[in-house]
């Protein structure tokens, strides 16, 4: 390719390479609890997840939290391979039911031996941003009694769509639906959590106040003037600006996220339960079993 920069043009030769993007990250929180983020599902996610699980197990974890919040899905095979890590052989993972006359129903089952002891408690965090393959994984774990879901109901995207040539263009046609091991249709219904913990989010009434807060650069200015990301500073910011018409919990998350964005990536905590209600509830469940 030819690149034009600062008045000068020059040629570059680019070589394509296959890149395997990591979709799994992990760490230890609360001293003894394993925490895994699943950002999406690819064909490599199952292997990546297994490596992280094995690493955490060697550190003597007493429970595992898998965070699927805002995981929009991806490769269905990746979701099924991931569920295989935790389920014994012969468990239903998902069933695909086609429209009459389009395809035969297909049931997928777990294969091999579970890599994680059956007595290790597992929590999966979900919200409305958890969709498609993320829902397949969550449902397989929930319906087979291997994980407790905490958070809010998932998005509800569970269909198979095929693309056909149609005239001078193309048409996308739904040919099948995904069903959970318990026979529930995922599409437009989503997966209900076992324990409901609502997301902290802006209400419609708070949006104008939030926009003004950003326009005035209130958050970034506060962080610049108070660079220590301490709990005291975060709570002080929230208490100072509730008069702007934004809930204190929302303000807490906004300034915490600003502090995190200023940290070097390798210095950021894998998770912060201090101001995360859903994660806090997951930790409580791991500790108490209820």
Model regions and ranges:
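PDZ-domain C-terminal substructure recognizer with occasional recognition of PDZ-binding tails
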Residues: 1-25, 174-175
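C-terminal "post-core" interaction segments
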Residues: 25-65, 70-290
């Amino acid at each position: 390719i030819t690149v034009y920069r600062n008045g000068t043009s020059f040629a570059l030769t680019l070589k394509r390479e296959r890149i395997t993007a990591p979709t799994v990250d992990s760490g230890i929180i609360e001293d003894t609890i394993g925490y895994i983020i699943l950002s999406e599902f690819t064909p490599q996610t199952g292997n990546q997840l297994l490596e992280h699980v094995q690493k955490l197990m060697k550190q003597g974890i007493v429970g595992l939290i898998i965070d699927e919040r805002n995981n929009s899905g991806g490769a269905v095979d990746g979701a099924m391979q991931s569920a295989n890590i935790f389920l014994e052989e012969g468990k239903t993972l998902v069933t695909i039911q086609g429209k009459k006359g389009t395809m035969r129903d297909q049931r997928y089952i777990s294969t091999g031996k579970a890599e994680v002891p059956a007595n290790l408690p597992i929590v999966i965090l979900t919200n409305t941003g958890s969709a498609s393959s993320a829902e397949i994984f969550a449902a397989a774990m929930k319906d087979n009694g291997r994980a407790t879901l905490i958070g809010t109901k998932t998005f509800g995207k569970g269909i198979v769509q095929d693309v056909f040539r149609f005239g001078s263009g193309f048409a996308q046609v739904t040919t099948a639906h995904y069903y959970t091991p318990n026979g529930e249709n995922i599409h437009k219904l989503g997966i209900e959590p076992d324990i409901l913990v609502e997301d902290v989010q802006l209400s419609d009434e708070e949006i104008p106040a939030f926009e003004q807060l950003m326009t005035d650069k209130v958050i970034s200015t506060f962080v610049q003037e108070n660079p220590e990301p301490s709990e005291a500073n975060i709570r002080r910011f929230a208490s100072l600006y509730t008069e702007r018409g934004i809930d204190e919990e929302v303000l807490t998350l906004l300034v915490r996220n600003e502090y995190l964005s200023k940290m070097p990536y390798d210095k950021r905590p894998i998770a912060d339960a201090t101001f995360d209600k859903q994660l806090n509830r997951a930790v409580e469940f791991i500790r108490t079993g209820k």
